[in-house]
Amino acid sequence: MNNIFKGLITAIITPFRDNKLDLNALEKILEYQINAEVNAVVIAGSTGEGSSLSFEEYKLLLQTAKDIVNKRIPVISGCSSNNTACAIELAAESTKIGVDGFMISPPSYLKPTQGGIYKHFEAIHEASNLPIMLYSVPSRTGVDFTDETILKLSKLSRILALKDAGIDLERPLRIKSVINKEFNLLCGNDDLSLAFNAQGGVGCVSVASNITPKLCKELQEKWHNNDVKGALGIHQRLLPLYKALFVESNPIPVKYAMYYLGFCTNEIRLPLTEATDTTKKQIEEIITSLSIKV
């Protein structure tokens, strides 16, 4: 099975207008990504406010994204849920629509044991036939995979990658030393992506690449072509943006940035609220300093 989880993957925002999906804005956003030659996109993940969508909105968003992309790059659906049966349903609907893979985090709030986490993913794996990227994001879920659970899950044939949004930079080394099959490790934090790659990572699932996909793609390419100095130069240039995108809960700052660039409204779903004036000013100054052209 081809491993689609590598390189620069953009975690796409979900644009709204008048509390409905703005599908015209979605097309502009996706074409911007495709033109920058990103390796794949994630739809309805954390950055895409997936947990704030109704099931009907989720289906419409995925179907529209799949139609717009039209097989030019892989489309990965966020299928995370606290309820295993619901996660299976999200994966089943995604499969019908024709996505290329899933990104799934452990259930949040419930705080399952490692045994429960394993059985959750095993059930989704057995109910589907598409590749899965595990998503470690303990700051949101309240639980994380142990190395042992990652190793055990990697033995399931279609679990092919881990997106790691934690801060344990030794983990890629530890995981690579015990997993024999091709199992890709991707960073879930833009600011740590080069350090993560240096420890065995093969890419980044990025928030910043919503705003500047060409620079983020160039950074990953330079690194993997052994141009460490060039990659580091881009990374240093983008560091203020990385930091600004998390001064408030993601995706509040990136949603404002995309509005400022003209892609969509600044509308965000409760319980999230729009960026403060201080954050807006910071985002505007950084975008201006980067001379981003869309």
UniProtKB/Swiss-Prot annotation:
Pfam families: DHDPS. One of its GO terms (molecular function) is 4-hydroxy-tetrahydrodipicolinate synthase activity. Keywords: Amino-acid biosynthesis, Cytoplasm, Diaminopimelate biosynthesis, Lyase, Lysine biosynthesis, Schiff base. Pyruvate binds at residues 47, 205. InterPro entries: Aldolase_TIM (IPR013785), DapA (IPR005263), DapA-like (IPR002220), Schiff_base-form_aldolases_AS (IPR020625), Schiff_base-form_aldolases_CS (IPR020624). One of its GO terms (cellular component) is cytoplasm. PROSITE patterns: DHDPS_1, DHDPS_2. Catalyzes the condensation of (S)-aspartate-beta-semialdehyde [(S)-ASA] and pyruvate to 4-hydroxy-tetrahydrodipicolinate (HTPA). Belongs to the DapA family. This is 4-hydroxy-tetrahydrodipicolinate synthase. It comes from Rickettsia bellii (strain RML369-C).
